[in-house]
UniProtKB/Swiss-Prot annotation:
Protein name: Anthocyanidin 3-O-glucosyltransferase 7
Pathway: Pigment biosynthesis; anthocyanin biosynthesis
UniProt EC number: 2.4.1.115
Binding-site positions, UDP-alpha-D-glucose: A162, Q164, H179, W182, N183, S184, E187, D203, Q204
Gene Ontology molecular function: any one: anthocyanidin 3-O-glucosyltransferase activity
Xref: Gene3D superfamilies: Glycogen Phosphorylase B
Key words of the record: Glycosyltransferase, Transferase
Disulphide bridges, residue numbers: none
Biological process according to GO: anthocyanin-containing compound biosynthetic process
Protein encoded by which gene: GT7
Protein task: In the presence of other necessary color factors, this glycosylation reaction allows the accumulation of anthocyanin pigments.
Assigned protein family: Belongs to the UDP-glycosyltransferase family.
Listed Pfam families: UDPGT
C-alpha cells in the first residue's frame, strides 16, 4: 500500500493508473502525467472538482506541496446541469418504486464490460428480482441473454441513455453499479446512493478503492470483474443487509458535507472566491 503518502494508506500499488509505476511508461497517457507532474509546482493554483471535507488529509498534503489547491466542487452542485426531457419515462417509473430499492446501472460513455460480464450482470438482475434501470448502448444489447428483456420487463428498464443526475437524486435509488469515473462518484455522493464498482482504466481503480476501503460507501467487485454470484451478493449486501445500511449512513454524511461546501460560507465557495481574487490580482499585475 501507499503508506508514505498521507491519506493513501489503503491504496494498493495495483490501484494506480497504468503508466504511473507499471504498464507502458512511454504511452501518451504516461507522458501526459509526467508533464503534468513537472508543471503543477509552477502553477499559481490547482483546481479540483471535489470538496475539502471528502479528503482533508490528501488536500492538506497537496497544499504543502503546491501553491494553491482549490477544491471548488462538486460541479454538479455548484452548477447543476439543466433539466432534460424524460424521454424514456424513467422518473415516472421510479415514482412507482419503493424507497432505496432500485439498482441503476451505467458504465459511462466510453467503456462497456465484455459480453460475458454483461451476461453475468443480466443473470444477476433476473435472479435477484431487484428493480433496475440499465443505461446500455444499443450495440451492446445484442449480448444480453435471449429473452432477458421480456422476462424482466415487469421490474426493469434497459435504455440507451438515462438522465443520470436526476436518477441518482431520486428517493427510489438504492444502489449504483458504476465504472467509478470521478464525475459519477461525485453524482452518487450528492444523490446519497451507495455503489457497486466495476472499474476499467485510468483513475477508476483508485476511485473504487476509496469508495470501498476509505469512505466505505460501496463495494468493489472481486478481481474487478462482474460475475453472477458476485453481483447478486453485492446487490444483497447494499440493498438488504446491515452493511448496506451503514454505507447509506456514510454516504449521506458525505452528501451533507458536499452540500455544506457549496453553501455561501462553505469551503468550495471560499475556494472559488479565492480563485476569482487570484485571477483579478494577476490581471491587474499584467496590466
Amino acid at each position: 500500500t501507499l503508506n508514505l503518502i498521507p491519506g493513501m494508506s489503503k491504496i494498493q500499488i495495483r490501484d494506480l493508473p497504468e503508466g504511473v509505476l507499471f504498464g507502458n511508461l512511454e504511452s501518451l497517457f504516461s507522458q501526459m502525467l509526467h508533464n503534468m507532474g513537472r508543471m503543477l509546482p509552477r502553477a499559481a493554483a490547482v483546481l479540483m472538482n471535489s470538496f475539502e471535507e471528502l479528503d482533508p488529509t490528501i488536500v492538506s498534503d497537496l497544499n504543502s506541496k503546491f501553491n494553491n489547491i482549490l477544491c471548488i466542487g462538486p460541479f454538479n452542485l455548484v452548477s447543476p446541469p439543466p433539466p432534460v426531457p424524460d424521454t424514456y419515462g424513467c422518473m415516472a417509473w421510479l415514482d412507482k418504486q419503493k424507497p432505496a430499492s432500485v439498482a441503476y446501472i451505467s458504465f459511462g460513455s466510453v467503456a462497456t464490460p465484455p459480453p460475458h460480464e454483461l451476461v453475468a450482470l443480466a443473470e444477476a438482475l433476473e435472479a435477484s428480482k431487484v428493480p433496475f434501470l440499465w443505461s446500455l448502448k444499443d450495440h451492446s444489447k445484442v449480448h444480453l441473454p435471449n429473452g432477458f428483456l421480456d422476462r424482466t420487463k415487469s421490474h426493469g428498464i434497459v435504455l440507451s441513455w438515462a438522465p443520470q443526475v436526476e436518477i441518482l437524486e431520486h428517493a427510489a435509488l438504492g444502489v449504483f453499479v458504476t465504472h467509478c469515473g470521478w464525475n459519477s462518484i461525485l453524482e452518487s455522493i450528492v444523490g446519497g446512493v451507495p455503489m457497486i464498482c466495476r472499474p476499467f482504466f485510468g483513475d477508476q481503480r483508485l476511485n473504487g478503492r476509496m469508495v470501498e476501503d476509505v469512505w466505505e460507501i460501496g463495494l468493489l467487485m472481486d478481481g474487478g470483474v462482474l460475475t453472477k454470484n458476485g453481483a447478486i451478493d453485492g446487490l444483497n449486501q447494499i440493498l438488504l443487509q446491515g452493511k448496506g445500511k451503514k454505507m447509506r449512513e456514510n454516504i449521506k454524511r458525505l452528501k451533507e458535507l458536499a452540500k455544506g461546501a457549496t453553501e455561501p460560507k462553505g469551503s468550495s465557495s471560499k475556494s472559488f472566491t479565492e480563485l476569482a481574487n487570484l485571477v483579478r490580482s494577476r490581471g491587474s499585475y499584467e496590466n
